């Protein structure tokens, strides 16, 4: 199993960041790697089990299922239902935590997956998507960001 994990400090309070992230169907509004997002399952976008289809900015698509969401802990997890990448058993989570006095936040985004083709390109694609997501989130909030790990 391959793992990717990036933690960033974003100069915005946790509640502001969580308000953006928790809207499972709005990723295309802030992630520059996503051109379009629709919820397919007929469930509320912020309910466990809902499925979103992402049309990626560079072409292709991914269908993702929201596995869990905890508004008190400010974290959620999701998995891939279908992807054009040579990736299986994809599970990811995003967690928001207060940093310092609470005016800044730590955002940890991690993914675990198997690659059907052991080409390192797929690890790089997932890494780039997560890093671009961290950067896009900070940009949406007009906040500075530093990746720390």
For each of these PLM feature ranges, what is it?
Residues 1-41:
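Hydrophobic ligand-binding cavity/cleft-lining segments
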Residues 6-8, 94, 109-111:
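A structural signal for short, well-ordered beta-strand segments
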Residues 8, 52, 65, 86-87, ...:
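Amphipathic alpha-helical hairpins
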Residues 17-21, 27, 52, 66, ...:
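Hydrophobic pocket/interface hotspot
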Residues 29, 56-104, 112, 143-147:
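Hydrophobic-ligand binding "helix-grip"
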Residues 47-48:
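Short, solvent-exposed linear patches
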Residues 106, 113-149:
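A conserved amphipathic terminal alpha-helix motif
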């Amino acid at each position: 199993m391959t793992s990717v994990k990036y933690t960033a400090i974003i100069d915005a309070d946790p509640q502001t960041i969580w308000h953006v992230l928790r809207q499972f169907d709005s990723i295309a509004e802030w992630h520059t790697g996503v051109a379009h997002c629709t919820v397919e399952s007929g469930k509320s976008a912020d309910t466990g089990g809902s499925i979103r289809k992402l049309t990626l900015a560079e072409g292709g698509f991914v269908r993702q299922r929201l596995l869990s969401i905890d508004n008190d802990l400010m974290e959620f997890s999701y998995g891939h239902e279908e992807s054009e990448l040579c990736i299986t058993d994809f599970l990811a989570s995003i967690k928001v935590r207060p940093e310092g006095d609470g005016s800044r936040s730590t955002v940890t985004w991690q993914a675990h997956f198997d690659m059907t083709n052991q080409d390192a390109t797929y690890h790089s694609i997932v890494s780039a998507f997560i890093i671009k997501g961290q950067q896009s989130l900070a940009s949406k909030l007009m906040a500075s960001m530093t990746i720390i790990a």
